[in-house]
């Protein structure tokens, strides 16, 4: 793990450059640093996928946000239909996402939020109200969606029902 300068290109047609306010630390990032990556991961890589920030620039095909909008980045692909589809191995259309250049090498990842800026596909950027506190919203893009999504979408727990959550990490606390 190193802290260094990277070069971001201008956003592609369907990309958004986000000036970041805050970023969460997902346990999957720790796994990537400690172990060999899963298929589809490439090194060097900018890690991070859950963050909040403000749109600094956008590609000409991006319609759902504009410069100055506050946004959340996430690991979930909007799939251009507002139906979340998980990114598989942090790729889109089976292609690793190259988002910056470092020491002459292309750097990959889906959102790369452990930086001052993130260059991400519009498919992993969601608008949020500009008056929402940005210091606590970064975890919405992963921990909240995963924990709350497991309870509401997967288990379909109804009001008044009880469940036991084992594990009081970021995801468990959001369940």
PLM ranges: what are they?
Residues 69-70, 117, 162:
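Residue-level marker of beta-strand positions
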Residues 123-124, 129-175:
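Mid-domain Rossmann-like dinucleotide-binding core that forms the NAD(H)/NADP(H) cofactor-binding site
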Residues 28-34:
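Cytochrome P450 core scaffold surrounding the K-helix E-X-X-R motif
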Residues 3-5, 52-54, 117-119, 125:
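Conserved hydrophobic/aromatic beta-strand scaffold that supports enzyme active sites
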Residues 7-23, 36-86, 129-131:
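Glycine-rich beta-strand-centered segment in the early N-terminal region that forms part
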Residues 74-117, 122-123:
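Cysteine-cluster motifs in flexible loop/terminal segments that predominantly coordinate metals
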Residues 1-3, 36-37, 108-109, 145-148:
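Short gly/ser/thr-rich secondary-structure transition/capping motifs
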